[in-house]
């Protein structure tokens, strides 16, 4: 076999190997959600992606499918780097300007909500990957119209809570207190969690109603999160400053795709190498 043909064959093999590696899916990152007051996405996920109960959650699935709910802990911008207000336009705050989560921006008054009152409030954030950073929580100003898309100018300039997060979380939660100002009617609590070990940031909208005695919207149970883990497309494998992969959430099926692709490349390489050797001997 000529050297030219050998080189050509190796070139094809290299291209095939590169293609296999390129087609390997890259898991998205996900790191938690507000459970008290429960965020929009967490509340709809708790109802069940396949059979949601409230009309707004049914409409979300009809519009965007079930995957956004199975990926309830992923509403993020990978390279926010403290520039959230520049990267997220008005009307897209709840989705972090991501089309996958566009339904979260719907200006509706039937989102699952939590009744609140002015004064101290105990926030509860479910962590699926703990990070060092700052969680800043805002509330809409008095006079906010929940039938209109949320704008940055709708948020009170003074946060209701600021919490320094660490790389450890007690029982899988960040628990911290804040102070809710006097308000009436329906409002949105908006959370920005900016990491300081990475440019990544996370966002959520929670609907609250002052003076409401209605039972608060439920947050997902631990049993549900564990059972639904195989449906998730998210993972937390040491990216963006994580020295070790957190173990709070079981790995998703997508985690196994890279080893499979590498095995396929190895097999293809071995087969092609054997074929080239055989041809050279015959030549």
Predicted regions and their residues:
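Extracellular Ser/Thr-rich, low-complexity/disordered mucin-like segments
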Residues: 222-277, 282
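Secretory targeting and sorting signals
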Residues: 1-30, 260-280
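Internal, hydrophobic beta-strand segments that form the core of beta-sheet-rich folds
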Residues: 183-198
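Exoplasmic/lumenal beta-rich domain surfaces
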Residues: 142-172, 238
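Beta-strand-rich interaction surfaces with strong enrichment in secreted/lumenal proteins
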Residues: 110-113, 160-167, 177-179
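Short beta-strand elements
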Residues: 200-222
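N-terminal "mature-chain" segments and other terminal, solvent-exposed stretches
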Residues: 29-135, 139-145
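Short, hydrophobic beta-strand segments
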Residues: 127, 174-183
């Amino acid at each position: 076999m000529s050297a030219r043909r050998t080189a050509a064959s190796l070139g094809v093999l290299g291209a095939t190997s590169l293609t296999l590696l390129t087609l390997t899916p890259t898991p998205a990152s996900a790191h938690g959600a507000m459970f008290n007051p429960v965020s929009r996405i967490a509340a709809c996920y708790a109802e069940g992606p396949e059979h949601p109960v409230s009309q707004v959650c049914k409409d979300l699935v009809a519009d965007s499918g079930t995957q956004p709910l199975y990926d309830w802990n992923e509403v993020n911008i990978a390279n926010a780097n403290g520039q959230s207000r520049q990267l997220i336009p008005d009307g897209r705050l709840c989705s972090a300007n991501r089309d996958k989560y566009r339904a979260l921006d719907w200006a509706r008054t039937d989102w699952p909500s939590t009744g609140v009152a002015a004064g101290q409030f105990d926030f509860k954030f479910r962590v699926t990957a703990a990070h060092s950073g700052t969680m800043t929580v805002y509330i809409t100003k008095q006079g906010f119209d929940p039938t209109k898309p949320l704008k940055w100018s709708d948020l009170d300039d003074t946060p209701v809570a600021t919490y320094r997060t660490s790389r450890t979380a007690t029982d899988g939660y960040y628990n911290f207190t804040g102070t809710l100002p006097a308000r009436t009617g329906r409002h949105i609590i908006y959370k920005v969690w900016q990491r300081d070990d990475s440019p990544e940031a996370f966002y959520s909208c929670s609907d609250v109603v002052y003076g409401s005695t209605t039972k608060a919207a439920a947050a997902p149970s631990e049993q549900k999160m564990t059972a639904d883990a195989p449906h998730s497309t998210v993972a937390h494998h040491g990216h963006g400053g994580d020295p070790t992969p957190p173990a709070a959430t079981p790995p998703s099926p997508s985690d196994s795709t890279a080893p499979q692709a590498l095995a396929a490349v190895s097999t293809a390489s071995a087969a092609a190498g054997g074929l080239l050797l055989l041809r050279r001997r015959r030549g």
